[in-house]
Amino acid sequence: MAQQQRMQGQPMIIMGDDAQRVKDRDAQEHNISAARAVADAVRSTLGPKGMDKMLVSSMGDVTVTNDGVTILQEMDIDNPTAEMIVEVAETQEDEAGDGTTTAVAIAGELLKNAEDLLERDIHPTAIIKGYNLAAEQAREEVDNVAVDVDPDDKDLIRSVAETSMTGKGAELDKELLSSIIYDAVNQVAVETNDGGIVVDAANINIETQTGHGVNESQLLRGAAISKDPVHDQMPAAVEDADVLLLNEAIEVEEAEADTSVNIESPDQLQSFLDQEEKQLKEKVQQIADTGANVVFCQKGIDDMAQHYLAKEGILAVRRTKKSDIEFLTNVLDASVVTDLDAASEADVVAGSVTRDSDDELFYVEGESEQAHGVTLLLRGSTDHVVDELERGVSDALDVSAQTLSDGRVLPGGGATEVEVASRLRDFADSVSGREQLAVEAFADSLELVPRVLAENAGLDSIDTLVDLRSAHENDDDEHIGLNVLSGDLEDTFEAGVVEPAHAKEQAVTSASEAANLVLKIDDIISAGDLSTDKGDDDGGAGGMGGGMGGGMGGMM
């Protein structure tokens, strides 16, 4: 039905017949239901005992993972509110490297508790104000609970990496992997003028190999490039390498405009072939004149050019991935040549290029003092194994680097959430008005984390939360959390279950901002069909306008 307004006694049509509109409380219920559906899709993956999801793309590609951001990015979501929650995970991944599932789950719980407040006639503005106050106080309390990290404390930083990998594909070999990760971040860490530490993630690369055990993974100085020489007669390795990085095809230049040539005799054809060969020989000579004996080319290399490069004794690799070329610039302290005509000896850098014929990898090391870069060579039995291993190690790398830079860690196992929630309830007593109820709701939302950890471990979530609250009444027990492996409550900091403080602060920030953004919406205007059926109490997918695109990307 067309939306109408009356002006001077006459109806005015301002929306088309196909347009639909949902306002006020219906709009809030619609959005909250959509957001909760996304949060509930990943909450069962939280923690060491979390379950995996199988994602099947429209092309039939299968991904098995419990990585929150991977699941949400692969889901075929067709709802603007749900996409806001996906952005929470993406922001968390970009800013902190881990904690995506925690951030999304808390956002969903904040909206669930906000819905209860709305039913009690608490205005959205009061809820938003209360959530903002609570988020600010929560970040302050996280900092108060945090423990400072000595950059030389290898065991503690390894514990951060191991906590991140627990429950993921990297868990079984987490001791080996955490040691590799610690060495990697330390090798590229740089001390700043003010005494701080910065770890540039661009100086760490991950390469994967199938057909081996995870326990054969290793840390390499420099880069590992999964490529072959373009010609059999080329050297397989060059110890004293002079390397040129090239982003220009070593091929015959094509005419800028479409042209046609009539060839009337074999001599004419030979003339064209000779001209092409001359162009290729000139390009190869340009490379040789720079003094380079190794070329990593991002684009193609003509067969004839390969022949002449081999005659010059130059090792050449074609179609090197852009990401590998960029990493090689760090490893070699080199720049990329984009125009061979302008190439010179200054573009060539010294290094070492060796070859592992079994793994079909080039190992590249730089010699400059400004050269940086290490490679984690991860091995696994199958593609699925190494893909999940890479995701787990990537997250662990990020949180280890964050810990080294930020210098603060927190007890895991829900200890931080319960302690901060307890302090927020004390803070709520100082908040006047209905905002106090929102602060208390925020505290309740944080406690979702220990509840879900217990739930996913097959424990009673209510009993676990009650026991944790009781333990945290003692000022000396702020590190008491749930050991999901044993089912006992213990000092998780002493047990080595630790998390980076920055990731927890970012999770609080991302979750609260997303919840407030959803709560501010009181009107939805759609040009097409807009379903407004609410989901069930568990945040079912009903109520998501257009649904979730046929489910979670084919997830079964």
Curated annotation (Swiss-Prot):
Disordered as annotated region, ranges: 530-556
Family: Belongs to the TCP-1 chaperonin family.
Keywords: ATP-binding, Chaperone, Nucleotide-binding
Chain intervals with Gly residues compositional bias: 540-556
PROSITE patterns tied to this protein: TCP1_1 (PS00750), TCP1_2 (PS00751), TCP1_3 (PS00995)
Underlying gene: thsB
Organism: Halobacterium salinarum (strain ATCC 700922 / JCM 11081 / NRC-1)
GO biological process, one term: protein folding
TM segment ranges: none
Molecular function per GO: ATP binding; ATP hydrolysis activity; ATP-dependent protein folding chaperone; unfolded protein binding
Protein name: Thermosome subunit beta
Quaternary organization: Forms an oligomeric complex of eight-membered rings.
Function: Molecular chaperone; binds unfolded polypeptides in vitro, and has a weak ATPase activity.
